[in-house]
Amino acid sequence: MNIFRLAGDMTHLASVLVLLLKIHTIKSCAGVSLKTQELYALVFVTRYLDIFTDFISLYNTTMKLVFLGSSLSIVWYMRHHKIVRRSYDKDQDTFRHLFLVLPCLLLALVINEKFTFKEVMWTFSIYLEAVAILPQLVLLQRTRNIDNLTGQYIFLLGAYRSFYILNWVYRYFTEPHFVHWITWIAGLIQTLLYADFFYYYFQSWKNNTKLELPA
């Protein structure tokens, strides 16, 4: 494992911890899209079908369990916790996320590295993760005002993907035959979706003002 992969994993883990801190400590999910969280839960469920059959390392299995467990717990909190669910803005979070799921599934059935159930589901998870942030970004544009923890959560998610791109570049030049077009293209699309948010995030940090996205 290289430093970029480790930085990506730790940044991803930090993003989850920030969101759990907001939900568990403040007992609020205001500004958080349940649609995006449900998509992430589906991403990890379909990606880690091999969790109990293919052992790579203790680190790898631990990270899989953490991301799978945390994503499901966040969805549970937002749907069922008697206090947290009251802060969920259902009227604003109206992005039809099934319109993301179905095209990603069809694309995975057509474009994959091997036509097996696990491989198609893994490919589906890659495509879905690339666009899973869209309901969250739409929600933020509608509400405009973004609290610090939500802003940090989204920034860390974008940073995680950026580190993974650096990881791929590093491995391309240091490992023979390291070519994964599906992962690369999906990861690049995912990173580009954060570009607008990054711009306003750094402007807010530079000017020491509250983070707001244009409507």
From Swiss-Prot:
- Keywords per UniProt: Endoplasmic reticulum, ER-Golgi transport, Membrane, Protein transport, Receptor, Transmembrane, Transmembrane helix, Transport
**GO MF assignments:** ER retention sequence binding
Extract the coiled-coil ranges from the record.
none
Annotated TM spans: 3-21, 36-53, 62-82, 99-112, 120-139, 152-170, 182-202
Q: Which GO terms describe its biological process?
A: protein retention in ER lumen; protein transport; vesicle-mediated transport
Q: Give the Lumenal membrane side ranges.
A: 1-2, 54-61, 113-119, 171-181
- The organism's place on the tree of life at top rank: Eukaryota
Q: Where in the cell is it found?
A: Endoplasmic reticulum membrane
Q: Which Pfam families match?
A: ER_lumen_recept
Q: Which residues lie on this side of the membrane: Cytoplasmic?
A: 22-35, 83-98, 140-151, 203-215
Q: Which GO terms describe its cellular component?
A: endoplasmic reticulum membrane
Q: How does it sit in the membrane?
A: Multi-pass membrane protein
Concerning InterPro entries, the annotation shows: ER_ret_rcpt (IPR000133)
Functional note: Required for the retention of luminal endoplasmic reticulum proteins. Determines the specificity of the luminal ER protein retention system. Also required for normal vesicular traffic through the Golgi. This receptor recognizes H-D-E-L.
Family per record: Belongs to the ERD2 family.
Its name, as the record gives it, is ER lumen protein-retaining receptor
Give the organism the record lists: Petunia hybrida (Petunia)
What broad taxonomic lineage does this protein's source fall under?
A: Eukaryota, Viridiplantae, Streptophyta, Embryophyta, Tracheophyta
- The gene from which this protein is expressed is ERD2
